[in-house]
Amino acid sequence: MTTRLLYETDPYLSKFDATVTQVEGEWVELDRTAFFPGGGGQDADRGWIEDLEVTEVKGGDDIKHKVPDHAFTVGQRVEAEIDWERRHDLMRGHTAEHLLFSTMHKINPELELVKISITPEKKCFFVKGEVNWNLVSRAQQEANGAIAAQLPVTHVWASKDSEAVKQVRIKAERIHGDKVRIVSIGEIDKAACAGVHVQNTRELRMLLVTKLTSARAKGGDVEVEFLTGRDAMDKALVLSAYALQAAESLGSVPDDILSSLTNLKAEEERSRETLRSYAKESIARLQPVRLGDLHLVSGVFQGIDKKTLMDAANEHAKKAKTAVVLASVDERTLLVVASSPDLELDCREVLNSAMAVLGGKGGGSKCFATGGAAGMERSGQAVAKAIEEIKVRFAAK
């Protein structure tokens, strides 16, 4: 027996009665249900059947409700209720996702929707394509304009191969069966979707993008996180206060924060470049200490980038019978141990002894090894330990 899906005709129905049609352990099937089993990236509902908690809902032809510790029997009439506050939050989130992606796609038609995740804890979607805050700002303005316009949100069923379906956003490979449910937001968006939605955009009250996260790989997906309703309003107030405080700290006004930060970053980069230039000169002038036949070059520097430190270590290690121990300290300590090929010295062993002092990790080859750890408090001790290890190894020869 196929479950009658009450949420398809009335997504606002929160209480209903039904008859138990099947029981399998903790899982209960009903002849009809308002519990949405999840779909379109939206979480499944939670709620109660006869005051017993429904902890999970699974879809299919027959909707299954997980009700631990129940004693229901086939044929029993039951009263059920979904967690409406949770459901309505998810409905708002799902409609907001449709609205926001649609406005973003209008600005950049190359965007492709990859994945959706609408849960009580987090509402987001993933897109492939170029996304930046300028695009998001424009899309948000249009989306919130649609919310203010109180646009109707409707749905219709259509044949999978009908002309109507050809005009909507759809991933055909995800459609099972011959019918497609089309959800429309006014004339702004039409998309194939199995989720439950609000009836009018005014229920969203407000939409706010709170975070963009790009995949590390170039050209990877971008995660767009957002809030709706009161959560969006509260977050907007907090971010507004942060912006005002930041502007005050920068000696600027809120409208000029970005230009002030750009200037500050440029100034910081100039300072870093000056520091790198000074560091290169300082490291190049390092004089080796003679320990028998061994030449030992060592030094600790403030805020030198990894490449500069490694290049300098390589340069010194080109000289015969030379061991090198260099460190850069800032928020992290970076340590480099290198040696000329004519030395019987395993730089990895020396580095590991020094890393034990720092509590960090590292690796490399016999003639070149690097490691790092948070903090700078024990950087001097780590360098001293590396030098001690080198001395011990050559004193034994």
Q: Where in this protein do the model-derived segments appear?
A:
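Conserved nucleotide-binding/hydrolysis modules and their immediate coupling elements
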Residues: 1-76
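Short, hydrophobic/aliphatic alpha-helical segments
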Residues: 20-34, 75-88, 175-190, 344-361, ...
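A generic structural motif
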Residues: 28-30, 60-70, 122-129, 336, ...
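Active/ligand-binding-proximal structured segments within catalytic/core domains
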Residues: 34-49, 73-126, 367
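Glycine-rich, acidic loop segments that terminate in or are immediately followed by a histidine
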Residues: 41, 186-203, 211, 217, ...
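Functional cores that coordinate and move charged inorganic groups
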Residues: 86, 106-221
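A conserved active-site cap/scaffold subdomain adjacent to cofactor or substrate pockets
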Residues: 198, 203-258
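Hydrophobic helix-and-loop "lid/oligomerization" segment in the mid-to-C-terminal part
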Residues: 244-331, 339
